[in-house]
Amino acid sequence: MQIPSKLKPYYENIAFEQEDSKMIINLGPQHPSAHGNLRLILELDGEQVVKARPCIGYMHRGMEKMAENMIYQEFIPTTDRMDYIAASANNYAYCAAVEKLCGLEIPRRAAVIRMILLELNRITSHLLWLATHALDIGAMSVFLYCFREREYVLDLIEKYCGARLTHSSMRIGGVMLDLPENYLEEMLAFCDKFPNDLKDYEDLLDDNRIWRLRTENVGVVTKEQALNWGCTGVMLRGSGIKYDIRKEEPYLLYNEVEFGVPYATQGDSYARYKVYMQEFRESLKILRQCAMLYKDTSPEILATHPEYVSASKEQILTQNYSLMQHFVLITQGLKPPKGEVYVPTESPKGELGFFIHSDGTERPYRLKARTPSYWHCAFFEEMLVGTYLADVVAIMGNVNIVLGEIDR
């Protein structure tokens, strides 16, 4: 027998007042331009949006609660499924939080490999953004070209960890593997080729009349709005605020490499597009410097700390103590000291951070993920008001959200 629910549907609590001159429509959750299971309730006056309400939760999986029932190492593959376009960024942010909790310092080579993975992942994320954003506006050629280059980078990532999207490539205390043979040569070959591809994209879009009409003065975000709504990443830098966590609070070896922080002052969709295009070039600059840093590092890729990190495979197979220590870590999990940490990082979409409260056991007492797409999606409530229905899809694509990290 079905028990009647006392809870009213979510949409019944939304204060939309139907008037003769206005119309309420649903954009999504099954819509090709929603970039996931996002539902937007829009109130229109003609074709102009007068009220907007994003409705999320269609892909909610309870990841933060899942973390409370897993040992610390078990949760790493789950982070892949948050922003599944930038899995390495999620892996790193989580591992960095646990390492800070345990007081671990990773080897220099592991830090370089992490930076390589993060910047390659940033490029693949930005390429997917440009491809889908251009497709939303009708630029089919750019969509195909971006996927062509993205395949090359995905092949590089796959050569390292065996996966194209859900990498699980990092470990608490370091990384899973050293770089394969000839990896740096292939990466540098891409770094030499990709600037020409970027120029092709810009030749197709920069002065394209339709592209500029659909992006200039569309989706304008002021400095005050960006700060008030918690915007980060390109959403913040496109409004004139030159803030990048890799510069402001350097982690890994970002303080040892030279790179710029692209920004624009107009705050519209076109300004954010120009920031993204420049970020490609800065990532290439970082990758070239990482190739130089890698050559000056010793071969260790995991921290040496038996309480939290397993020994090398060779030691596990030849030394009784290392085997026992590995068995305990895998079956019982590591036990960080009691305390709280929050570690912010600069993911391709903005500030991605993990808060962990440890009670001294092998499982986190509380884990909270601060994901950029969640805040940017909430901003639609104000950002879309006053725009036209035809521009809603263009703005959604430009903001660059992914529902995996919104719903979690």
UniProtKB/Swiss-Prot annotation:
Keywords: Cell inner membrane, Cell membrane, Membrane, NAD, Quinone, Translocase, Transport, Ubiquinone. This is NADH-quinone oxidoreductase subunit D. The lineage of its organism: Bacteria, Pseudomonadati, Campylobacterota, Epsilonproteobacteria, Campylobacterales. NDH-1 shuttles electrons from NADH, via FMN and iron-sulfur (Fe-S) centers, to quinones in the respiratory chain. The immediate electron acceptor for the enzyme in this species is believed to be ubiquinone. Couples the redox reaction to proton translocation (for every two electrons transferred, four hydrogen ions are translocated across the cytoplasmic membrane), and thus conserves the redox energy in a proton gradient. NDH-1 is composed of 14 different subunits. Subunits NuoB, C, D, E, F, and G constitute the peripheral sector of the complex. It comes from Campylobacter jejuni subsp. jejuni serotype O:23/36 (strain 81-176). InterPro entries: NADH_Q_OxRdtase_suD (IPR001135), NDH1_su_D/H (IPR022885), NiFe-Hase_large (IPR029014). Belongs to the complex I 49 kDa subunit family. GO terms for molecular function: NAD binding; NADH:ubiquinone reductase (non-electrogenic) activity; quinone binding. The gene is nuoD. GO terms for cellular component: plasma membrane. It catalyses: a quinone + NADH + 5 H(+)(in) = a quinol + NAD(+) + 4 H(+)(out). Its EC number is 7.1.1.-. It is found in: Cell inner membrane.
